[in-house]
Structures are given as structure tokens and as C-alpha cells.
């Protein structure tokens, strides 16, 4: 019997190398083979294509494209038939990022120069396949409301028929379904009926509901092609807590956290609607028809287009009340017309709380680590069709929207992160959309909830063209974002040397520090970038100040004018009241956040509470000569000539540059009694200056106190006061003085120093 050869190799013979069959000859053959194996792992379990927006049903390990499971939502896995609730749907963000990296690597290995590696491949292919797929599902999460939202869209390939000009055109039917638990009052008439009597009455048929809602019956003159077309154009509205309708009958399923009612108005013309985002695809045929028939519009801004018979087109009166949050323009039972916020086709709202599942837990991650934003916004109906057909614009519209804007109004609506359309376009690198939004009056200096501006986003993602475009439209180059990071911090941190050069040429400050005291040069190891950032500054502060004045002058003068006097005599108060009538302004007796102008009698600012609050809020602090000049000319004069110099001017420029407040990063503890400056007034000043109040006296010898790594933003760079963030304030106008403390992060400071800092709008040095 022959001996079995040993399974281990001897030390003289090297172990066999795993066989790797190269896909093609030439360079990187093994990498191509490995990429081919990776491609097999990134395929959908149903369509066997590369995953597009991968999702899992939660009950099994199979992963599908979002468009492949539209008919399986809420039923089960199409492969292993494992039951799955609709709330178990999860988007695999990590796998989506891996697919995008795979696509970029494939383009590099195969020398595919035609494709743009910067574009989002999965999203671009999704729009390309939208006309070949009938159903697509979209899920995303709202970290703030801890809810999931799901939209199943049915995209029609064939061209939408135009509505006939006569009054016999087909209209959509509106049906209403009310859930059994909890009982919901549907209309004004239904409020009079008792809830117990609802059980005695049988369910109403669809035809009866249509008759009660004064809907016209369907005629044989309809120009729709098939019965299925009629099903797709029915609008179904639900109340509060609801059951889910079949996704095959309704084109869109929307799981909102609000659980409110939305009724969508259907019109035969698709000329002007709220643009759908991402998979709400507007076909080119539909867009072309909107150009041919611009007079046919959906009800917008409390008015409806009038048809040939004198009746409003597309304005039904369903017998349900709508939620204020949804803001629908559908007429209610009382006859009110409300503005629609969603598309006029197949909208179904379902409350997540009605579905049989536990509390939804959603992981909230940092925005900059996410691959794409969860919620985006829609453009106004006045967007030109050429921009709608642009692929980059469609990539910007990557998620379903809850915003509808009328034409000519800047897109000021935000998603749950506070991002506007300009933020989304800057993140995605959509140059055409950024240019369009800026030309239509969008503010380039708007901040989201974290403090980022569109310039921050463009610098962080390396979009040089968008950075130049924003700077051309007077974007502030030194404004701070999250943790007081400037755009130069973001550009240096991500190694974008071209953007660093552009920012420096527009006056970006090299010495700007964030909340941790780090400059832009501290965030990069690249020698070419460090050499640029280590150059001495010359006129950066002057250039940025001049830029901010030019940017905000027009915006400031277009706003309301609110006046308040400080230290004025009775005669001066009468003249100020007269100026109120001349300029159609408002005069306040007490200071609030709406005040724009503080009038003082002479060339020095008053140390009154009104004047100091005006300084801290960046108001115009003007001499009384401005009032006389305005009364003489009977119009508003330029404020710059009459502004009190020093602290008031520095504060106003600081506000126009959107920089942090005076006491940003500082903490205060008020110890002892305060008589000359009341404690309540000091608390108001500290809060208005961005400082924080400590309820306990800080301990200088505490390791926790001394290890705080934040700095004061407005302290001088070469001063040790920058690292002092906790102040113990005492009253120093009396003979009794507490023991002085000046140890590390904790310093003792008199109340007069606090007042002097406010008047000068700078952190003055403390005497040792």
C-alpha cells in the first residue's frame, strides 16, 4: 500500500502560491481578477446586477437593490420568503460607499476616461434606469424624529397625455380611508356625530364617498389609455394612524413621522409641480409638455387656474382636513385652499406608529462621515427645463423632499440638518445648480444647524469651481462653522492646495483658530500647503472687513428698521419719534433682538444696558446727528458716517462676517454681591455675548478644569488669556476684595473688566 504524501511542505520547498487567474494580460492583471471577484459579491440577490442603493429586509442576509423589492415591501424576502416588516428595511450605507469606490477603481483599471469619477455612480445609474423600471422604493431615516420614511414610486415610461381643453377632461378620484384605531374625525360634519355611532353604520362604498365629495363621475370621453392608468392617477389620502395600502395600486408610499394628512391635487397637466427628488423622475416628455402648456398649473398660492368653463382646474374638495405641517393647498370642507407640498400623483401617507413594530432605533452619525445627505430639497417650479434635464442637477436631487417653493422665491427651506439647496449642490459638486441658485438670490452665507456654510462644504469636498463661484457671489471667506472651523481649515485638512490658494487670495486669515486653538497650518503635513500658510499676514483683516460691508449693505437696508434711544433727552426722544414716522420704522422702549439701530446723544457709546446690548448684538450704534440728517433729507441716510467708532464698529463687522460672539468659549461664575452693576444685568450681558454661566465656582486645582482644551476665540493670539476660559467675576468697587486667583484656566476678574470688554468689544488684558 503506497504511503500517503505528507500534507505539509518541507522547509526546502516554498509553499504553493494561491492560483490567481488574471483576467487580461498586461499591468494590474491580479487586481483586475480580484476586482472581478469583488463584483460577484456586490451583486443583487434578485436581479444579479451591481447593487444600486443596497437595502436589506432585516429578516435574512440577502441584499437587494432598492428598485428590486418594491413588490415585496411589507411581505417577505423574494429569495428565501422570510417574512419581514416594512420598518425592518435598512439602507446599507457602508456597502453603498464600497460600491462607489469599486466603480472608481474599475474606471482606473480599465482606463475608462469617459466616466466622471467624481460623480456618484450609483445615483447616476439610478436615473438612467428610471425609465426602464416601473417600481422603485426609497427609504431613509430622520435622526431628529427617530422615524423611518419609505417611498415607493411608480415611474411611467409612456408619455403623459395632455389634458383636453374642454371641460370634459378626466379628473382623478379621491378616496379617504380612516383607520379603526384610534377613531379619527375626518371632516367638519363628522365632528357632530358621536364616535359610538360609527360602529353601527356600514362602511361606505367608493362611489358613495365620491358622490358626497362632489366628484364628477368618470366619463367615457376619457383620454387615458388603460384602466391601470386610472389606478396610477388616483389620489388616496389617509388620516392620522393608518394601515398601508397596496404598493402596486398606489405609486408612492410615504412613511412620515408626523402621521398627518396630506391630500395631493391631481391635474391633467404636469406643467408646474414640486420637483420630485431622486427617484421621483420627471421624464423628458413630461418636461417638454410643461413648456408647451405653461398656462395649465397646479393650485399654487391660494389660487387655481381657470378652465374654459370658468371652473378651477384640478381643484377638488375632499371632505378631510389637512395637517398644518404638510401645508396642502387642497380645499377642505370649509372651502379653504391650502398649498400642496407633494407631487400631484399617487401620494399615500402612513404613520409609522400604526405599524406593528417596536420603537425604531436609528444610529445618528456625523454628517461629514455620511456618504450622501438623507434629506434634500426640491427646486422651485420655476426652474428651467434645461436644468431639470441636467444629470448633475438630478444627482443633487438625491432624496425625497418635503419642500415646495414658488417661482422667484429663494430656496430658504431646509432639511433636518438645516441644509439648503445650496448646501446640497455644494456637497455634490453640481456647478450648474449652484450657479442657478446664486443667480436667483440664494444667500451664499447661510448656515446649517452645525454652522457650516456652502463654502465650507465646497472646501471640504474639494470642489474648486464651486468655491470660486461662491466667492464671486460675496461668500464670506473667514466665517466659522462647527467648532469654529474656517473654510481654510477644511481645505488644509483635506489637502486641497488649489482651494487654499484661492482662499488666501480672497483674504482668508492664516491665524484663524478654532475652538481648540488650532490654526489651518496645524491640520496639514503637506509641505507645499504649510509653506503657503506660514507666510506672514498683511491686510487680511482689512480685506475681510471691507468684503463683509459690501456683502451685507443691501441686505441690511432691505430689512425692517427698529430704533431705540439710549441716554437721550426728552427733546431728542421727540425727534426720534418723528423719525419713526418719516422712515416708517418701529421704535422700542426696551431692547430686544429685533433692534437694528441704537441712538446715543454724542460721539461716545453709553454704558447703559440698552447700549451695551446693542453693541453685543452687532447693531448700528449711531450719533444723534444721524437722526437730524434723516429728518432734513426725509430719507434714510448712510449710517457709516455717523457710527460710533471703536467697539460698536468692531461688533457690527464681527456680526456681518458671521464670526463668533465676544465671549465665545468663556465661562463665568458670579461670586458675591453686586450693587453697582446688578447681577441680572451682568447675566444678560454674558448671555448676549455668547458666554456661559457656571452654577458652581470652578476649582483651580481640579484636573478636570485644567484639562479643558478649548480656547477663547477673541483673545489675542500671543496672550496666555486665550487659554483662560473660566472667570470668577466679583464686584471691585468696594473695599472688600476676594483673594486673587490666576491659575491656568481659572482667573479672577472684576465686574468693571467685564463692562470694559463689552464697550470695547474685545477681551482686554487683566492686570496681574
Swiss-Prot record:
Q: Please tell me whether the keyword Cell inner membrane is annotated for this protein.
A: no
Q: Which GO terms describe its molecular function?
A: protein heterodimerization activity; protein homodimerization activity; RNA binding; transferase activity; zinc ion binding
GO BP terms in the entry:
cellular response to follicle-stimulating hormone stimulus; cellular response to ionizing radiation; cellular response to oxidative stress; cellular response to testosterone stimulus; DNA repair; negative regulation of apoptotic process; negative regulation of protein export from nucleus; positive regulation of apoptotic process
Q: How is it modified after translation?
A: Processed during apoptosis. The homodimer is more susceptible to proteolytic cleavage than the BARD1/BRCA1 heterodimer.
Q: Where is the signal peptide?
A: none
Q: Which residues carry this modification: Phosphoserine?
A: 380
The covalent link annotated as Glycyl lysine isopeptide (Lys-Gly) (interchain with G-Cter in SUMO2) occurs at 154, 413, 538
Enzyme Commission number(s) from the entry = 2.3.2.27
> How is this protein annotated for GO cellular component?
BRCA1-A complex; BRCA1-B complex; BRCA1-BARD1 complex; BRCA1-C complex; cytoplasm; nuclear ubiquitin ligase complex; nucleus
InterPro entries tied to this protein: Ankyrin_rpt, Ankyrin_rpt-contain_sf, BARD1_Znf-RING, BRCT_dom, BRCT_dom_sf, Znf_RING, Znf_RING/FYVE/PHD, Znf_RING_CS
Ranges annotated as biased composition (Polar residues):
319-332, 392-405
**Keywords of the record:** ANK repeat, Cytoplasm, DNA damage, DNA repair, Isopeptide bond, Metal-binding, Nucleus, Phosphoprotein, Repeat, Transferase, Ubl conjugation, Ubl conjugation pathway, Zinc, Zinc-finger
> Compositional bias (Low complexity) at which positions?
373-391
What's its job?
E3 ubiquitin-protein ligase. The BRCA1-BARD1 heterodimer specifically mediates the formation of 'Lys-6'-linked polyubiquitin chains and coordinates a diverse range of cellular pathways such as DNA damage repair, ubiquitination and transcriptional regulation to maintain genomic stability. Plays a central role in the control of the cell cycle in response to DNA damage. Acts by mediating ubiquitin E3 ligase activity that is required for its tumor suppressor function. Also forms a heterodimer with CSTF1/CSTF-50 to modulate mRNA processing and RNAP II stability by inhibiting pre-mRNA 3' cleavage.
**Which PANTHER family does the entry mention?**
ANKYRIN REPEAT DOMAIN-CONTAINING PROTEIN 39-RELATED (PTHR24171), BRCA1-ASSOCIATED RING DOMAIN PROTEIN 1 (PTHR24171:SF8)
Question: What does the subunit comment say?
Answer: Homo- and heterodimer. Heterodimer (RING-type zinc finger) with BRCA1. Heterodimer (via ANK repeats and BRCT domains) with CSTF1/CSTF-50. Component of the BRCA1-A complex, at least composed of the BRCA1, BARD1, UIMC1/RAP80, ABRAXAS1, BRCC3/BRCC36, BABAM2 and BABAM1/NBA1. Interacts with UBXN1.
Protein name, please? BRCA1-associated RING domain protein 1
Q: Which organism is it from?
A: Rattus norvegicus (Rat)
Q: Which gene encodes it?
A: Bard1
Amino acid at each position: 500500500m503506497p504511503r500517503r504524501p505528507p500534507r505539509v511542505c518541507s522547509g526546502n520547498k516554498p509553499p504553493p502560491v494561491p492560483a490567481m487567474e488574471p483576467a487580461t494580460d498586461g499591468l494590474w492583471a491580479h487586481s483586475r481578477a480580484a476586482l472581478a471577484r469583488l463584483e460577484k459579491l456586490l451583486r443583487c440577490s434578485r436581479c444579479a446586477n451591481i447593487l444600486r442603493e443596497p437595502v436589506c429586509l432585516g429578516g435574512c442576509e440577502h441584499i437587494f437593490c432598492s428598485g428590486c423589492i418594491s413588490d415585496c415591501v411589507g411581505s417577505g424576502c423574494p429569495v428565501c420568503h422570510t417574512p419581514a416588516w416594512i420598518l425592518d428595511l435598512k439602507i446599507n450605507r457602508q456597502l453603498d460607499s464600497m460600491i462607489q469606490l469599486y466603480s472608481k477603481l474599475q474606471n482606473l483599471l480599465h482606463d475608462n476616461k469617459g466616466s466622471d469619477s467624481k460623480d456618484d455612480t450609483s445615483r447616476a445609474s439610478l436615473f438612467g434606469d428610471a425609465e426602464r423600471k416601473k417600481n422603485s422604493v426609497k427609504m431613509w431615516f430622520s435622526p431628529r424624529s427617530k422615524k423611518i420614511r419609505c417611498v415607493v414610486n411608480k415611474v411611467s415610461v409612456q408619455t403623459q397625455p395632455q389634458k383636453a381643453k374642454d371641460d370634459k377632461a378626466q379628473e382623478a378620484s379621491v378616496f379617504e380611508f380612516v383607520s379603526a384605531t384610534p377613531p379619527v374625525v375626518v371632516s367638519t360634519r363628522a365632528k357632530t356625530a358621536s364616535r359610538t355611532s360609527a360602529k353601527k353604520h356600514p362602511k361606505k362604498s367608493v362611489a358613495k364617498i365620491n358622490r358626497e365629495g362632489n366628484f364628477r363621475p368618470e366619463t367615457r370621453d376619457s383620454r387615458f389609455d388603460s384602466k391601470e392608468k386610472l389606478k396610477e392617477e388616483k389620489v388616496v389620502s389617509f388620516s392620522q394612524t393608518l394601515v398601508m395600502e397596496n404598493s402596486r395600486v398606489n405609486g408612492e408610499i410615504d412613511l412620515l413621522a408626523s402621521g398627518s394628512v396630506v391630500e395631493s391635487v391631481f391635474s391633467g397637466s404636469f406643467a408646474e409641480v414640486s420637483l420630485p427628488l431622486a427617484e421621483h423622475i420627471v421624464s423628458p416628455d413630461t418636461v417638454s409638455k410643461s413648456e408647451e402648456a405653461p398656462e395649465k398649473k397646479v393650485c399654487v398660492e391660494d389660487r387655481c387656474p381657470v378652465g374654459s368653463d370658468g371652473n378651477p382646474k384640478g381643484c377638488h374638495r375632499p371632505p378631510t382636513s389637512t395637517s398644518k405641517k404638510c401645508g396642502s393647498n387642497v380645499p377642505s370642507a370649509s372651502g379653504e385652499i391650502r398649498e400642496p407640498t407633494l407631487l400631484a400623483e399617487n401620494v399615500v401617507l402612513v404613520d409609522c406608529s400604526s405599524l406593528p413594530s417596536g420603537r425604531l432605533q436609528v444610529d445618528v452619525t456625523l454628517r461629514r462621515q455620511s456618504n450622501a445627505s438623507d434629506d434634500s430639497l426640491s427646486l422651485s417650479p420655476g426652474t428651467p427645463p434645461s436644468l431639470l434635464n441636467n444629470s448633475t442637477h438630478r444627482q443633487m436631487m438625491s432624496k425625497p423632499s418635503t419642500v415646495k417653493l414658488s417661482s422667484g422665491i429663494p430656496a430658504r427651506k431646509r432639511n433636518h440638518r438645516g441644509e439648503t439647496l445650496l448646501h446640497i449642490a455644494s456637497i455634490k459638486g453640481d456647478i450648474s445648480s449652484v450657479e442657478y441658485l446664486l443667480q436667483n438670490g440664494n444667500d451664499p452665507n447661510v448656515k446649517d444647524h452645525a454652522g457650516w456654510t456652502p463654502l465650507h462644504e465646497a472646501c471640504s469636498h474639494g470642489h474648486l469651481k464651486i468655491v470660486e463661484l461662491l466667492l464671486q457671489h460675496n461668500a464670506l471667506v473667514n466665517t466659522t462653522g462647527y467648532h469654529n472651523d474656517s473654510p481654510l481649515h477644511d481645505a488644509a485638512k483635506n489637502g486641497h492646495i488649489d482651494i487654499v490658494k484661492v482662499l488666501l487670495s480672497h483674504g482668508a486669515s492664516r491665524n484663524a483658530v478654532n475652538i481648540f486653538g488650532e490654526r489651518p497650518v496645524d491640520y496639514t503635513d503637506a509641505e507645499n500647503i504649510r509653506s503657503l500658510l506660514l507666510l506672514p499676514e498683511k491686510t487680511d483683516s482689512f480685506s475681510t472687513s471691507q468684503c463683509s460691508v459690501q456683502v451685507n449693505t443691501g441686505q441690511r437696508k432691505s430689512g425692517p428698521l427698529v430704533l431705540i434711544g439710549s441716554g437721550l433727552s426728552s427733546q431728542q426722544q421727540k425727534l426720534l419719534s418723528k423719525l419713526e414716522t418719516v422712515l416708517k420704522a418701529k421704535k422700542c422702549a426696551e431692547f430686544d433682538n429685533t433692534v437694528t439701530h441704537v441712538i446715543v446723544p454724542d460721539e461716545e457709546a453709553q454704558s447703559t444696558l440698552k447700549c451695551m446690548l446693542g453693541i453685543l448684538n452687532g447693531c448700528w450704534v449711531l450719533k444723534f446727528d444721524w437722526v437730524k440728517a434723516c429728518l432734513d433729507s426725509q430719507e434714510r441716510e448712510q449710517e457709516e458716517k455717523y457710527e460710533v467708532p471703536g467697539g460698536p464698529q468692531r461688533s457690527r463687522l464681527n456680526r456681518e462676517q458671521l464670526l463668533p460672539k465676544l465671549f465665545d468659549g468663556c465661562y463665568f461664575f458670579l461670586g458675591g454681591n453686586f450693587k453697582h452693576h446688578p447681577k441680572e444685568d451682568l447675566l444678560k450681558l454674558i448671555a448676549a455675548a455668547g458666554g456661559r454661566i457656571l452654577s458652581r465656582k470652578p476649582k483651580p486645582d481640579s484636573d478636570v478644569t485644567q484639562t479643558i482644551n478649548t480656547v477663547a476665540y477673541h483673545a489675542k493670539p500671543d496672550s496666555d488669556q486665550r487659554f483662560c476660559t473660566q472667570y470668577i467675576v466679583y464686584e471691585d468697587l468696594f473695599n472688600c476684595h476676594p483673594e486673587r486667583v490666576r491659575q491656568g484656566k481659572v482667573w479672577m476678574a472684576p465686574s468693571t473688566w467685564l463692562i470694559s470688554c463689552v464697550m470695547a468689544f474685545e477681551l482686554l488684558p487683566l492686570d496681574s
